[in-house]
Amino acid sequence: MKLTCVLIVAVLVLTACQFTAAIDSRGGQENPAPRSTGLMRRKSQTERNCIPKNHFCGLLHHSRNCCTPTCLIVCF
């Protein structure tokens, strides 16, 4: 019986804490993550280090180093 009362009180306290936290956060985030604001964008092809079109990249494989997705001795 005592254990049941302790568990009920603990659940009520935790529920009250959740409601208090939810009410305090209604004003919005003070410091939102950069990814949610769009500040973290993928670098464009000119900003990243890549092999330009018509330059040697290797033999018969998909090269991540090419600015274009196709590599057959040279980047296409």
UniProtKB/Swiss-Prot annotation:
The principal localisation class reads secreted
Q: Which UniProt keywords apply?
A: Disulfide bond, Knottin, Neurotoxin, Secreted, Signal, Toxin
Q: Name one GO molecular function term.
A: toxin activity
Disulphide connectivity of cysteines: 50-67, 57-71, 66-75
- Expression sites by tissue: Expressed by the venom duct.
Region ranges (Disordered): 25-44
Regions that span the bilayer: none
Q: Which InterPro entries match?
A: Conotoxin
Signal sequence coordinates: 1-22
Q: Which GO terms describe its cellular component?
A: extracellular region
Propeptide span(s) = 23-47
As for subcellular location, the record says: Secreted
Taxonomically, which superkingdom? Eukaryota
Give the record's family classification: Belongs to the conotoxin O1 superfamily.
Domains: what does the record tell us? The presence of a 'disulfide through disulfide knot' structurally defines this protein as a knottin.
The molecule here is called: Conotoxin Cl6.2
